[in-house]
Curated annotation (Swiss-Prot):
Gene Ontology molecular-function annotations: 1-deoxy-D-xylulose-5-phosphate synthase activity; magnesium ion binding; thiamine pyrophosphate binding
Subunit comment: Homodimer.
Binding residues annotated for thiamine diphosphate, in chain numbering: 72, 113-115, 145-146, 174, 287, 370
Enzyme superclass (EC): transferase
Listed SMART domains: Transket_pyr (SM00861)
Protein's recorded name: 1-deoxy-D-xylulose-5-phosphate synthase
PANTHER family membership: 1-D-DEOXYXYLULOSE 5-PHOSPHATE SYNTHASE-RELATED, 1-DEOXY-D-XYLULOSE-5-PHOSPHATE SYNTHASE, CHLOROPLASTIC
Keyword Chaperone: no
Length: 635
């Protein structure tokens, strides 16, 4: 059977080990070809091919439920659940999503993009099953660092207290998240990987006793106590913590041995209550360069499959925002030992690996633990340090209570640097950084700013470090800057709450925020071709808003447009409208941004076009919205 013939996972049930191994080879081939062409996550999926095949041969996925943690591990799952023939559209507009989506397939039982959610979701399904009197298996597959997340441990704590609730947790232990795992849990798992399988000891103990001359022949049920005692001794050295939490522990199992995996999963399904199967895998399995460099090949842009090297750019590009941020932070930290960079398992993505390389004592990786990262920063700030929490906008959502309760109520000077703010592209709705403006600006003792380009970002990094009167957040987009000149040092801090005028005009006032400022300038240029003269303001701050600048301009010009790469509800445009109303400046306002909808995966430019946020589209909206007031304009 060829992989292309598999349209339903039940077709795996009658395949031999040899046939499954051939399917595994073909899955890796398809996985590699697709990611090399379109980009995407590489190492995680390559590491779970046999795990997926072995597990699915023991399940009926028309009935049984499988919940994949994080989601980017699930490429093999997608390939064998009816998506082989359109897998080439991975992460492309209107194509296969890079993460799990319930609306994409009936086999995507629970959506996932963020880490550590699978056990909670699986336990909820198992409890619902029991309440309804149904009978199906529930399997939560967690790994790629997700077990370091507090939510996963909370779910284990709860599940272990429910001995009659059947749930199987499969730990995909590849020793990694995006970067190598950190912390005591990771160290404990590494010890477990080196130990013999507990279930093997338990299952073979009786047989070994029977082979002992004389003694073996008299093996009786009374000797079960000895058998149990030996099992407890083994567990005490390996899975003691898991067993003490109420789970039956099995493993470690070779995650690339199909026969061993199938046997183990079949055994696990027969054990009542919560069961954890510990599977040891190799991230990037089957592609040597990915096995050797697990960090770089966690995810890749399109690359040369033969060499593993990135495809050359058509022309040189300006540095990425994250690179400029990291370089600036390192320069400042070299002269200020109080600066401490904090990441939640995203050192490479945020650029903090550069700080780790230069100043390891001023760097902390807490693992996938955003809540802990924020309160840790609060503790550091309370002792006079200058903590810088470097985190993707979408992941800071997970620590919202800590921002309010532990940082802002106590007015502690924590600097939040929000990478991937705005439209992120191919990662889709789970990773869009749409909401930070709205969820941060409503908190007292919080300053919120955004640079118009990479040069202003350098100044804002200094501004954030120097700000000690409460918390401050800086949002900046994914991708490359505009190529503006950068300084190695000597940056000037920006006065808190002060914007700047970039262009003057009397017909319409355009207020751009962050990544939309250059688009505002381009829009103004298009408007000028229609005879409309626009004033363009780089707002810089959404909180505090520069009302001293904005209110007189709005009053004089009489027509206001706001532009933001974030949600309109509660966003920058809302802040401007509130300020105008509160100060009795009653002028029409056109807010341009992301409406009340989820933004699916696509290239950022494609998403902006879908949302009407290209300069030409915004110019047209302005002309149409203010047409009665611009009656002399040739629209």
């Amino acid at each position: 059977m060829h992989l292309s013939e598999i349209t339903h996972p039940k077709q795996l049930h009658n395949l031999s080990i040899h046939q499954l191994e051939e399917i595994a080879r073909q899955i890796r081939e398809k996985h590699l070809e697709t990611v090399a062409t379109s980009g995407g996550h590489l190492g995680p999926g390559l590491g779970v091919v046999e795990l997926t095949l072995g597990l699915y041969q023991t399940l009926n996925l028309d009935r049984d439920k499988v919940i994949w943690d994080v989601g980017h591990q699930a490429y093999p799952h997608k390939i064998i659940t009816g998506r082989y023939h359109n897998f080439h559209t991975l992460r492309q507009k209107d194509g296969i999503a890079g993460y799990l989506k319930r609306c994409e397939s009936k086999f995507d039982h629970f959506g996932a993009g963020h880490a550590s959610t699978s056990i909670s979701a699986g336990l909820g399904m198992a409890l619902a099953r029991d309440m309804k009197g149904d009978n199906f298996k529930v399997v939560s597959i967690i790994g790629d660092g997700a077990l370091t997340g507090g939510m996963a441990l909370e779910a284990i704590n709860h599940a272990g207290h429910l001995p009659k609730t059947n749930i199987l947790v499969v730990l995909n232990d590849n020793e990694m998240s995006i970067s190598p795992n950190v912390g005591a849990i990771s160290r404990y798992l590494n010890k477990m990987r080196l130990s013999p399988p507990i279930q093997f000891l338990q299952d073979n103990l009786e047989e070994q006793f029977k082979q002992i001359p004389f003694v073996g022949e008299t093996f009786t049920p009374e000797m079960e106590g000895l058998k149990g005692g030996m099992k407890r001794l083994a567990v005490s050295k390996v899975g003691a913590v898991i067993e003490e939490l109420g789970f039956t522990y099995m493993g470690p199992v070779d995650g690339h041995n199909l026969e061993e995996l199938i046997t183990t999963f079949n055994q696990a399904h027969q054990i009542p209550g919560p069961v954890l199967v510990h599977v040891a895998t190799t991230k990037g399995k089957g592609y040597p360069v990915a096995e050797e460099d697990k960090v770089s090949y966690h995810a890749q842009n399109p690359f040369n499959l033969a060499t593993g090297k990135a495809l050359p750019a058509s022309k040189p590009k300006p540095p990425k925002y994250s690179k400029v941020f990291a370089h600036t932070l390192v320069k400042l930290a070299e002269n200020n030992p109080k600066i401490i960079g904090i990441t939640a398992a995203m050192a490479t993505g945020t650029g903090l690996d550069k700080l780790h390389g230069k100043l390891p004592k001023q760097y902390i990786d807490v693992g996938i633990a955003e809540q802990h990262a924020v309160t840790l920063a609060a503790g550091l700030a309370s002792e006079g340090m200058r903590p810088v929490v470097c985190i993707y906008s979408t992941f800071l959502q997970r620590a919202y209570d800590q921002i309010i309760h532990d940082v802002c109520i106590q007015k502690l000077p924590v600097f939040f640097c929000l990478d991937r703010a705005g439209i992120v592209g191919a990662d889709g709705p789970t990773h869009q950084g749409m909401y930070d403006i709205a969820y941060l600006r409503c908190i007292p003792n919080m300053v919120v700013m955004a640079p118009k380009d990479e040069g202003e970002l350098q100044r804002m990094v200094l501004t954030g470090i120097k700000h000690t009167d409460g918390a401050i957040a800086m949002r900046y987009p994914r991708g490359n800057g505009y190529g503006v000149p950068l300084m190695e040092e000597g940056w000037e801090a920006i006065t808190i709450g002060k914007g700047e005028i970039l262009r003057n005009g009397d017909d319409v006032l355009i207020l751009g925020y962050g990544s939309m400022v250059y688009s505002a300038m381009q829009t103004a240029e298009i408007l000028s071709e229609h005879g409309v003269a626009a004033t363009v303001v780089n707002a810089r701050f959404v909180k505090p808003l520069d009302t001293e600048l904005i209110l007189p301009l709005a009053q004089r010009i009489g027509q206001v447009v706001t532009m933001e790469e974030g949600c309109l509800m509660g966003g920058f445009g809302s802040a401007v409208t509130e300020a105008l109303m509160d100060n009795n400046v009653l002028v029409p306002v056109l807010r341009l941004g992301v409406p009340d909808k989820l933004v699916d995966h696509a290239k950022p430019d494609e998403s902006k076009a879908d949302l009407g946020l290209t300069p030409s589209q915004m110019a047209e909206r302005i002309l149409q919205s203010f047409k009665p007031r611009l009656s002399t304009i040739n629209v």
